[in-house]
Design a protein with these regions (language model features):
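N-terminal Rossmann-like NAD(P)+-binding domain of SDR-like oxidoreductases, especially those catalyzing
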Residues: 1-123
């Protein structure tokens, strides 16, 4: 089974990759390295430095993938007030590009990952 993880250099993506590598899955992934670090990516991962917003590249690299785990997003909720267009492009347009490329390539399953950061601060 070939798993592709977006945001693979971030905390969530890197830990998901480690889990599937231990189960002997083929793991590929992408990250724009804005919030993640290449140091988090295991050497066994086929890594692509690409933004999820790039539909053409996403369509190319998702060929032959069975499952997409979409964990890429800007999670700096406080900063989104200062740069809403950047956040919308990365999080919304990026997600639409990933889903479109996955559908185009007949990926069997898409899993959308989230984190507690989406809920903001506890009041």
């Amino acid at each position: 089974m070939h798993i592709f993880i977006t945001g693979i250099a971030g905390f969530l993506g890197a830990n998901i990759a480690d889990y599937y590598l231990k189960k002997k899955f083929k793991v590929s992934g992408c990250d724009n390295l804005v919030g993640g670090s290449l140091d988090n990516v295991d050497k066994k991962v086929n890594f692509f430095k690409v933004s999820c917003e790039d539909l053409n590249k996403m369509s190319q690299i998702l060929k032959g993938v069975d499952v997409v785990l979409h964990a890429a997003a800007y999670a700096h909720e406080g900063l989104s007030n200062f740069s809403p267009v950047s956040f919308a492009n990365n999080n919304v347009v990026g997600s639409v590009s990933v889903f479109t490329a996955a559908i185009k390539n007949k990926v069997k399953r898409i899993v959308y990952c989230s984190s507690m950061a989406r809920y903001g601060n506890i009041k």
